[in-house]
Amino acid sequence: MPSKPGRRRFASAGAKASGVILTLASTPGMACVCKTPSGSLSGNLQTSSHSTQTVVCNGMSPGYWKNWPDQWPSGCYPTTTAYQTATKFATIFPNGATTLYQTGTLMDVLISNDPAQDPHNLGAHLVAAYLNVKSNKISFFTVAVLKTIWHDLYTYGYYAPAAGVKWFAKDVANYLSSTEN
């Protein structure tokens, strides 16, 4: 029987990529980023591989939410007024290690440029992701997923998107950044 080197290369490539495929399949929400980690290889995803629904990938950056507070979704308040109190970061993401995380508002976290108070801009990207979810700008994860990520980071020091994979604060910030336009 004639040799089929093309099939062997395909099978070999498949075996090498299987870890990536298994990782993506193990946490469905994390498989659906708007941009690949490199930000340019495969571009934006339009649909989830496990659903026929269109994936909404219109996430905005921390800078957008900082500069456009009038676009914040209902129930999220950038500043305190006579009618409502500004939404505190700790109300959504409790038990933070820094003063900013413990007492600051969502807007304070977006505005902060202090790496000691918001390492890797993790808090700013969490706030942006939270506002993106609440305003239906992204549909591939939920507030509950964001809260789990935060909980695991402060409890264990990392978030595990899949078995055997550990994302530390910088990794989570990079992932969340990849969901922003």
Segments predicted by a language model, with ranges:
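N-terminal secretory signal peptides and thylakoid transit peptides that target proteins
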Residues: 1-18
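Soluble extracellular-acting proteins and domains
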Residues: 16, 31-181
